[in-house]
Amino acid sequence: MNFKYIVAVSFLIASAYARSEENDEQSLSQRDVLEEESLREIRGIGTKIIGGLKTAVKGALKELASTYVNGKRTAEDHEVMKRLEAVMRDLDSLDYPEEASERETRGFNQEEIANLFTKKEKRILGPVLGLVGSALGGLIKKIG
């Protein structure tokens, strides 16, 4: 009788352990899915922000170009225009971030991919905002 009791208790413990392992695996896969969805949302928001900035920079660049067509540019103005053109090329390369990130991030895990994406955004957005601010400031000074 004791042997049957020991076998029954062992079987119950083993089945409970198997169920808990199965539940752990399911919760991990659900967590992975949620993390992936949140990364997609973050990328979507970043893409929208970059798209808006790109449109604003293109508008500012066109305005600056039309301003400088009829007038002479100083060396400083020429340098600002060169920087804006370089920024525009960088922004154009961000139109297809999935392809670029696929090439750059083969073999990385999701967290490293998210870190690379935010580093790239910071690297591009910092100079863009500075250049747009200085260009618009110069334009406002000349108009006003």
Swiss-Prot record:
Organism expressing this protein natively: Bombina maxima (Giant fire-bellied toad)
Cellular location(s): Secreted
Cellular component, GO annotation: extracellular region
Positions bearing Isoleucine amide: I143
GO BP field: defense response to bacterium; defense response to fungus; killing of cells of another organism
Protein name, entry field: Maximins 11/H11
Function: Maximin-11 shows antimicrobial activity against bacteria and against the fungus C.albicans. It has little hemolytic activity. Maximin-H11 shows antimicrobial activity against bacteria and against the fungus C.albicans. Shows strong hemolytic activity.
Keywords for the protein's UniProt record, in alphabetical order: Amidation, Amphibian defense peptide, Antibiotic, Antimicrobial, Cleavage on pair of basic residues, Cytolysis, Fungicide, Hemolysis, Secreted, Signal
Family: Belongs to the bombinin family.
Propeptide: 19-43, 74-123
Tissues showing expression: Expressed by the skin glands.
Modified residues (Asparagine amide): N70
Signal sequence region: 1-18
Domain of life: Eukaryota
Keyword Mitochondrion set for record: no
